[in-house]
């Protein structure tokens, strides 16, 4: 059956295994994943609704938050529905071109998320270090340009991937030992010289993570200096308190990345399922917890949600 699905260059379909070695537990593993995905959908949709409905939240900080919520929705929805179909219905087939599209969206929106977190760090820097110029610096025009730049950077860096993968002959078969079409998992099936794909993928990841994190850290160095120069402890606490949600979002996004990178080096001989579970955790954790972080720590959002519940109880 499989040979008939193979053309002279690539398979008509790939087969996504799921989590290798844990196939018998897929139904149970799907429960926390489904719960996390549901939370991500509800949380991020709620954030978008509140920001759109409340005119007082049409400020730079919340517009960036709306971008982050949109990206988290796309990121989780790019992989989770297909993953749950594998776990529940053993629907392992994915069209070759659908696989490339999934890969493009997955990696592009991951890059966009990093860019938006950097933009949010810039927002906090201007708000705390240059408060008198906040509204004149972060204009609607600049926010639009930042959003467009985030999209343009991601699309520019990820557009080569599908074309690089189309040129290979996949003589190692169509079975991908993963839950979704991750770039390196697909490259492993290709014959020929894949060194450029390997180098390009690693170089882009390092460029994005190192560059964006460097500027985020630099922003917080200036923020910390400005906060420590404030006269009263109450003012310092209030100023830094406005950054807590953003710091939480940064930690929720980059901590799984760091853990995954460390595990790939110190536990490179670990079973593939360990790395796959970490990769899924990296995809699901930020979209699930970011709305919770901002809902708990942001007064305006928290009060709006509480007001909705109070109306229902009246």
Curated annotation (Swiss-Prot):
Residues 49-56, 123-141, 220-239, 297-314 are cytoplasmic. One of its GO terms (cellular component) is plasma membrane. Residues 1-27, 78-101, 163-198, 261-275 are extracellular. Glycans are attached at residue 5. The keyword Hydrolase does not apply. Keywords: Cell membrane, Disulfide bond, G-protein coupled receptor, Glycoprotein, Membrane, Olfaction, Receptor, Sensory transduction, Transducer, Transmembrane, Transmembrane helix. Belongs to the G-protein coupled receptor 1 family. This is Olfactory receptor 52K1. It comes from Homo sapiens. The gene is OR52K1.
